[in-house]
Amino acid sequence: MRVNITLACTECGDRNYITKKNKRNNPERIELKKYCPRLKRVTLHRETK
């Protein structure tokens, strides 16, 4: 079951990325290092509802 998720920057709170994940393989929340355009650097992005 693939669902759409939003990734939000942990430092500024902006929701910068939309992606999909498989809930069966990854039931926990995803954390990825992605580029934040507001801070102009790579930061940790977490899955939000």
UniProtKB/Swiss-Prot annotation:
SUPFAM superfamilies: Zn-binding ribosomal proteins. GO terms for molecular function: structural constituent of ribosome. It holds the Pfam family Ribosomal_L33. Coiled coil: none annotated. GO terms for biological process: translation. GO terms for cellular component: cytoplasm; ribonucleoprotein complex; ribosome. Disulfide bonds: none annotated. Keywords: Ribonucleoprotein, Ribosomal protein. Belongs to the bacterial ribosomal protein bL33 family. This is Large ribosomal subunit protein bL33B. The gene is rpmG2.
